[in-house]
């Protein structure tokens, strides 16, 4: 293999929990001046719109949120700022994940991230610890498609500059991502979802291929495949 493309949530960082979503809603509600339950319900109702390219920028997302909960326009800027902070807090990898990514790149492999992600994640990404550890990242909110849309896999392959058959896709399986990778001509391996048992997941499907305990096992797995 010449490249590895990783999923983000549940793979490189922990998948969010309902409790974390409620805490984020509380912090945003305090800025907007509305109830936590109102923002929490917004998150529940708008997953597709927030991830599929309908709201590609942080400003788009903040405006949509404020208007959806009948907040005043003057809080759109502060809400965008709070969303960015919340995004930054979601992008903190464990030291063992950092080491695994460094190990892959030290072997000359190209490394990328392909994530169903909303605009606050894309906005926070450039200054996150993960950004310096990979060669490229593709986020669904900016790309305008959700996994397993073939366009996402073509995009990450183009940005990695590596043919599909020389690229391994690694993910926890949300969004039918592993079958999408196989359909794109990539090899694929599942990792057990990073996070707690109640972590949020979307679009899980059955997977009968190889499964690793965590991304930390990817470097030795690739060595074993040679």
Positions of predicted regions on the chain:
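N-terminal helical cap/lid subdomain that shapes the substrate entry/recognition surface
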Residues: 1-99, 107
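Asp-based, Mg2+/Mn2+-dependent phosphohydrolase catalytic module
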Residues: 1-4, 14-18, 30-31, 76, ...
């Amino acid at each position: 293999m010449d490249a590895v493309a990783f999923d983000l949530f549940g793979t490189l960082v922990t998948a969010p929990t309902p409790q974390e979503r409620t805490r984020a809603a509380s912090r945003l509600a305090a800025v907007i001046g509305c109830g936590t339950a109102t923002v929490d319900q917004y998150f529940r109702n708008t997953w597709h719109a927030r991830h599929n390219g309908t709201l590609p920028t942080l400003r788009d997302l903040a405006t949509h949120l404020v208007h959806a909960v009948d907040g005043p326009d003057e809080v759109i800027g502060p809400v965008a700022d709070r969303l960015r902070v919340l995004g930054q807090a979601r992008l903190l990898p464990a030291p063992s994940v950092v080491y695994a990514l460094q190990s892959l790149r030290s072997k000359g492999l190209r490394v990328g991230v392909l994530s169903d992600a909303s605009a606050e994640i894309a906005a926070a990404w450039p200054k996150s610890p993960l950004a310096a550890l990979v060669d490229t990242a593709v986020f669904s909110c900016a790309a305008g498609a959700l996994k397993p849309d073939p366009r996402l896999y073509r995009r990450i392959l183009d940005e990695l500059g590596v043919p599909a058959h020389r690229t391994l896709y690694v993910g926890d399986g949300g969004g039918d991502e592993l079958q999408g990778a196989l359909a794109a001509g990539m090899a694929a391996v599942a990792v057990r979802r990073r996070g707690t048992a109640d972590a949020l997941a979307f679009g899980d499907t059955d997977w009968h291929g190889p499964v690793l305990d965590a991304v930390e096992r990817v470097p030795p797995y690739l060595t074993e495949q040679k």
